[in-house]
Amino acid sequence: MHSLNTRRGLGLAAAMTLAAGALVAPTGAAAPADPNGSTIDPDAATTLTVHKCEQTDTNGVKEGTGNEDPQAECKPVSDVEFTITKLNVDLTTYDGWKTLADLKGDVVKAGALKSTTVQKITTGANGLASFTDAQTEVGAYLVSETRTPDKVIPAEDFVVTLPMTNPQDTAKWNYNVHVYPKNTLSGVDKQVTDKPAPGSGRDITYTITTSIPKVDYPGGARIKRYEVVDRLDKRIKKEALTPVVKIVGQNEVTLAETTDYTLITAEGKDHNWATIQLTEEGRRKASEARYNGNGETKLQVTLNAKFDAAVNLEGDLSNTAGLIPNDSPNFTWDPNNPGTTTDIPGIPTTPVLSKYGKVVLTKTGTDDLADKTKYNGAQFQVYECTKTASGATLRDSDPSTQTVDPLTIGGEKTFTTAGQGTVEINYLRANDYVNGAKKDQLTDEDYYCLVETKAPEGYNLQADPLPFRVLAEKAEKKAATEVTVTDIPKNAGFRLPLTGANGVIFLTIAGALLVAGGAVVAYANKRRHVAKH
């Protein structure tokens, strides 16, 4: 039985008691024992049996009565801890019932009446938590789910009275009450989309999908609190999240900020926090959509995580969300004041991870010079690529463009060797860890490629792209991926014939010397001829 139905049972009991006011002393004193059973016996044996059921699309639509319902659709949910706390009201008096009725079904206000009488039971494989006569007595009880298994949304707290007016005989009381609270399973899931962000500094998208509890919308029930909380890595710019909030399923509806939800961001000690808080109108829309939909009708929150261009993403980037699906007192989260906590409020998701690693590129040559500074000045760009038998084919990480562009990594597109012929590329997403999942089987598409766009003085450019991989095992240990690029001296080290101005001058001088030499020889020959004659 849903909590609203339980409260209706409470209201019905109160109404029946009020209707039987003639049987109750107007002074508020307890009525004498009634042999017909129309007044409450304060010493009667009482029991409360909780049937814990999984919420489906077809159960939870009939109002509970407090009686056992053998026909109830109930797939049991085990390992749910129920805590019942007796309220400080006397149900043997008119005033006690009126105190409850004046709360107008507000369970939170009922919590102010709690006593110190508390009992706990955990459901077994049959989904039952049976509070016996030894654990209960005549009175009103606040019933809470104080522990649930992972991925189970707890039902709302509710108030139940022992006894309740017997609906099958309204002249009598039912001291053995049965209730059927429902749980929605698989409450919250989170996914990361980092495939379009191979280089650090690019946007990463987080999608949080949460189940919506089913309530009796036509009967006036509404979800009383609904918050999606995201624990953000401090490197994410919390002021630039630009959330998109939708109800997805049979009929998709995009919710409007301010009207349907508010975004509250706050700074914590080790993390930042973002809370999507549904407004009253947003909760109404969610309640209506879930009632008219099915189990696939869910709330979806998409957050666009932005970073500073030169952000250090080396290692793991972890993100976890939580869901607060109702107004249970167990959920004490204050979105404006997270304090120093690192715990995820509500029902947590499994953490989603992105893994980025550093690449250290070392430039050398086949001549293996001792002076490594000779390899400085080489420039490289990085692409995603597909390895082929003959080399690699470059790809564009942005399919919306018609050109193949180099990756922007840490705000840079070109990386130049310096120092001892090296350059760091910070940082690249691991090829074997994409969109939050480990890739056990890598393919020829899972590569990056280096393209040399400028060679050092005296060396050839690389003729082909150079494929390499960044692996998660190294990234998570913050161990650099080392890539060595070996250049060949220009023209493979062979000298070419001299050309240009220097060569022409040399030939001119050589020609002049030959001419001068010839003139000297001719003059000498002439002198010898004259001397003979």
Swiss-Prot record:
Gene Ontology biological process terms from the UniProt entry: carbohydrate metabolic process
A GO CC term assigned to this protein in UniProt: pilus
Keyword Signal listed: yes
UniProt keyword list: Cell wall, Fimbrium, Peptidoglycan-anchor, Secreted, Signal
Residues annotated with Pentaglycyl murein peptidoglycan amidated threonine modification: 499
Topology with respect to the bilayer: Peptidoglycan-anchor
Endpoints of the signal sequence: 1-30
Protein name, entry field: Fimbrial subunit type 1
